[in-house]
């Protein structure tokens, strides 16, 4: 455990890590700057830790690419559960199979053939819905902000609002959820964005 940004980077360079818990409020160098430097060095999973409970801090952390966030004060049990979940996602990578097929819960997507099935039954998706679902499946279990989803699916030059995304999510839910009004797979994370649960 280190207590400032430069020391954190030096320790990472010296010893490496399987996962990093990164406090946004570090002396000497901001947590976001440390995160950017870590990303230059490695794709190690990062959980942002912050004393702030504001929505904007969570959004910034997730849009930077953090794997998860936890707000102080937190229990040891919560932190351990989050660490295990992030390591499980990163280590097993069970949402993607080497032959170009993605799987998450009841969903199966053959990216090359542009085929999607739910519980073994094929469904038809327009291109944007397919692209949206593909990105969600490649990040199964991870909170994705509206900004991340729009940039990835519609492009960084998109000038519309987030309603377009919400409409596409609603259409996707009507095709992949048993009860679209009460989704259990494509869920809303209030104030942040969406997450695909496996």
UniProtKB/Swiss-Prot annotation:
GO terms for molecular function: phosphorelay response regulator activity; transcription cis-regulatory region binding. InterPro entries: CheY-like_superfamily, OmpR/PhoB-type_DNA-bd, Sig_transdc_resp-reg_C-effctor, Sig_transdc_resp-reg_receiver, WalR-like, WH-like_DNA-bd_sf. The modification 4-aspartylphosphate is found at residue 23. Residues 99-198 bind DNA. Phosphorylated by SenX3. Keywords: DNA-binding, Phosphoprotein, Transcription, Transcription regulation, Two-component regulatory system. CDD domains: trans_reg_C. The keyword Phosphoprotein applies. Residues 1-87 form the Response regulatory domain. GO terms for biological process: regulation of DNA-templated transcription. One of its GO terms (cellular component) is protein-DNA complex. Member of the two-component regulatory system SenX3/RegX3. This is Sensory transduction protein RegX3. The gene is rgx3.
